[in-house]
Curated annotation (Swiss-Prot):
One of its GO terms (biological process) is antibiotic biosynthetic process. Keywords: Antibiotic biosynthesis, Glycosyltransferase, Transferase. The gene is aknK. It comes from the Bacteria. It comes from Streptomyces galilaeus. It is an enzyme of class 2 (transferase). The lineage of its organism: Bacteria, Bacillati, Actinomycetota, Actinomycetes, Kitasatosporales. Gene3D superfamilies: Glycogen Phosphorylase B. This is Aclacinomycin-T 2-deoxy-L-fucose transferase. InterPro entries: EryCIII-like_C, EryCIII-like_N, Glycosyl_450act, Glycosyltransferase_28, UDP_glucos_trans. GO terms for molecular function: hexosyltransferase activity; UDP-glycosyltransferase activity. PANTHER family: STEROL 3-BETA-GLUCOSYLTRANSFERASE (PTHR48050), STEROL 3-BETA-GLUCOSYLTRANSFERASE UGT80A2 (PTHR48050:SF13). Involved in the biosynthesis of the trisaccharide moiety characteristic of the antitumor drug aclacinomycins. In the first reaction, AknK catalyzes the transfer of 2-deoxy-beta-L-fucose from the activated donor dTDP-2-deoxy-beta-L-fucose to the mono-glycosylated aclacinomycin T (rhodosaminyl aklavinone), forming the di-glycosylated aclacinomycin S (L-2-deoxyfucosyl-L-rhodosaminyl aklavinone).
Amino acid sequence: MKVLFTTFAAKSHMHAQVPLAWALQTAGHEVRIASQPDLAEDITRTGLTAVCVGEPLLLEEQMQRVNEGLGDDAEIMESQAEAGMDMTETRPEMLTWDHVLGVFTSMTAMAFQNSCPERMIDDVVAFAREWQPDLIVWDTLSFAGPVAAQVTGAAHARLLFGLDLLGRMRETFLDLQEERLPEQRDDPLREWLTWTLGRYGAEFEEEVAVGQWTVDPVPPSMRFPVKQPFVPLRYIPYNGQAVIPDWLHEPPKKRRVCLTLGVAHREVLDGDRASIGELVEALAELDVEVVATLNEKQLAGMELPDNVRAVDFVPLNALLPTCSAVIHHGGSGTFQTALAHGVPQLIVPDMVWDTIHKAKQLERFGAGLYLHDVDNYTAQDLRDHLLRLLEEPSFAENCARIRREMVGTPSPNDIVPLLEKLTAEHRRDRGARGTVRGEQ
């Protein structure tokens, strides 16, 4: 069968798709990945075939403008909450109709439409009409995928990159909407998708918002309990092209700690919520070897202690198995890779998307710790947390338990037959096509 993956131009989101894309390709299926032109080179470096759609997204420039306009981190978080972009809310008393309506109003206008502009959707639909994929697998923020599937009749699945905030919030939204009078049931996401689909002569169904099914790489015990049908998937780390440095082949002389704030975070968000100076200061006095994946900009004006080795990039999939602990910002790639290798984690959450929820889950399962007051912590706080991870055996034991759970979850290769079956069940008549209004 033909399988089309779609994502907006964020390298970390595309990397989350690569293991499954390759599993399908090595099973004999034709695979393409569609994204904006600024991701094309990164896609082709994976050995997969890229399809350029829309104009360059220039995500880094967009985020820099947003950050410059909002100010410091506290102001950014406060502004996002006031704008209704807090999809992370879980407290029942806070999940009112006004809150969830505000979430979908702001997220649709500021996130979904910006990551998936009209031109991109047009191009994905045009390619899908021509190529006729049987299955479209889409990043949870890339609605061009389900729109193209609805227009062409392809089956479609949402592939998560972290916890299913969208699915959970959408269920809450629909439950609260049912309690409203018909004339008070605003639905910004549905309205946008209905208008978009109408341009191609297609109609909205709720599955366009959340997928016909979801492929979920989060360990089963850590998933949000959503009603959406899902296919469990073992997370397989993919770090892109890399050469393993010679020093990494040698066993560490002391307990090794990885300090990373994420490549995607520094490339896109142009800054770090955590103070790198405070992080390094906290580690300087400990009898450990630190490998810090920090670039020249992050290290500017800083004198590194003797026990800290700074490297611009090293694949975490090769580094973390040699580590006794990892300190990071809560990004999905680092979080999942550490779980896959059974490494205790200290999270300094950057408060983006699901990082605070992952931190809480990790601490609840006894597999790590996080800084509860991320804006007010000291070097001693960091040292105390890290020493607990290194000295208390329960953290490594609980990490090993989660790792066993992940190993027991079906791999990308294992789920290919199920995806073939689901595609056959959900794919519609290939004549189910529309045209953009005004086209002849």
